[in-house]
Amino acid sequence: MKKKALAFAAAACAFGMLLSGCGSSNGSDTAAEGANIITAYNSEPQHPLIPGNTNETGGGKPVDLLFSRLISFDAKGNASNEVAESITANDDATQYDIKLKDGWKFTDGTDVTAESFTKAWSYVANAKNGMVGSSFFSTIKGYDALQDTDNLKGDEQLEGLKIVDDHEFTVDLNKSDSVFAIKVGYSAFAPLPESFYDDTDAFGEAPVGNGPYKFQSWDHDNEIVLVKNPDYKGNRTPKNDGVTFKVYTKDDAAYADIQSGALDVMESVPASATKTFETDETVQAYNKAGSVIQQFTIPSSLKHFEAGTEEGTLRRQAISMAINRENICDKVLNGTGTPAVDFTSPLTPGYSDSLKGVGNLKYNEKKAKELWEKANAISPWTSDDKLTFAYNADGGHETTYTAVVNSINNTLGSEVAATNPYPTFNDYRTAVSDRKVQGAFRSGWQPDYPSAENYLVANYASAAADGNGSNDGDYKNSEFDDLCSKAAAAQTTDEANKLYQQAQEVLLNDLPAVPLYYANAYGVAATGVSGFEMNWQNLPVYENMTKSGK
């Protein structure tokens, strides 16, 4: 997300909604009342619906259904070829030959060709175009040449992409990347039709894709309507006639709509219902281990917390040790989250709960005070200093971050921390993206593809800093980058995972972000819905859902 930057807390009130169920958009003959249309809750997307410029769930959910990539994932995260006929790597994973299946079309009737991919990838990679997914293409040869915005027009192409014919192209990488064949399942790697380049702004408001659904309408701050794509020929054929994403800013209202049948599915529950939703007979409940991690990021340049300095490291570790994660998971999240011990998730290949430095994620009042005082000896923390925690108030995060702040202040014995809520997810994400947040800020990660690489490189690699990806804290550490590069070049999965674990140990010392908890995959559906399950991204499998009697 998607995705990535999560619009809502994936555990104690994962997604925010409006006080009352949002109104539906103007209907049409295609998505008419009485059709087998699934209504799903959502936030207003931060950006227009362009795959390469979407890295949060409000936009990520509709984008995923609108655009098919080279491969797709089933509910458990297993990959299968989708648009690709084959993806073949050379011996050291520095070159890939990609062949496409014949007959794929966009919903405007134009063909999906090799150029549909190479041109789209180059556009997203090109820094002149300001796409948030740019860093995902950093291993492709020629990426660095597309980062000098002063000397670019925006239409320059990645040197490493070569078209063989309409159904085949090759990818030359600047270093080994054994994860590349899985990475291309992420939405940033979606193909784009020629109409995109004619008017990118208009396209983002009414996208043309090649996925299981096609776009019908977008009533901003209200709903996004998708209908079944009758020409889709991939692995995710819808069992329903469409999905309407309804925008909420209060999760209690969304839950009430699930109970009444006015809304079909939501991938969370409000804090007020975390103790009772599994026994609530007016809903279908789902609650299993999930892949989402919730954390907060401390900007690398923040006063007293500067990355790479002795004071900054001491204070980051002290803050982390001052947080009682067990208490938050038990008392605030009511068992819908598990204290984090790394930067991935228990469902991620290579997960370990015994990494060097894991003690920095454990509650330790004595050590937290000791480290804080050592930092004070370097540069005193004064009454004018305050570590604020920004979050979106429409996402149900207040109870979690109130608990975080209280734990820090109770542990360190002073008013060190305070909450800093933003009214909406859009307000909050804009402030984060524009580097306007003068303090820590809520962050979370929903995997784009099932690999430790996705959690680590997307969020902490130097190439993903400075607005080129999801490294919103602008953390840069060459040792971490080198370990991730070695992992990508590893010949076996076990070797790669060991290197990713070493990279995590660098993060556990530096704490560019502070992991809080792993969110369960949990949510509710209306009682009249069939086929309700959550996938490896902690999201409903929308295409499998139907309504009784429809």
Question: What do these predicted ranges mean?
Answer:
Residues 41-91, 208:
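N-terminal lobe/hinge region of extracytoplasmic solute-binding protein
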Residues 113-120, 166-172, 211-212, 240-242, ...:
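Alpha-helical secondary-structure segments
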Residues 116, 123, 129-193:
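Surface-exposed binding/hinge segments that line
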Residues 167, 172-238, 242:
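Gly/Pro-rich hinge or "lid" segments in bacterial periplasmic/extracellular proteins
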Residues 196-204, 231-276:
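Ligand-site clamp/hinge motif
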Residues 317, 329, 414-428, 455-526, ...:
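Extracytoplasmic/peripheral linker and loop segments enriched in polar/acidic and small residues
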Residues 338-375, 394-399:
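Structural transition elements
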Residues 523-550:
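Long beta-strand-rich cores associated with HINT superfamily self-processing modules
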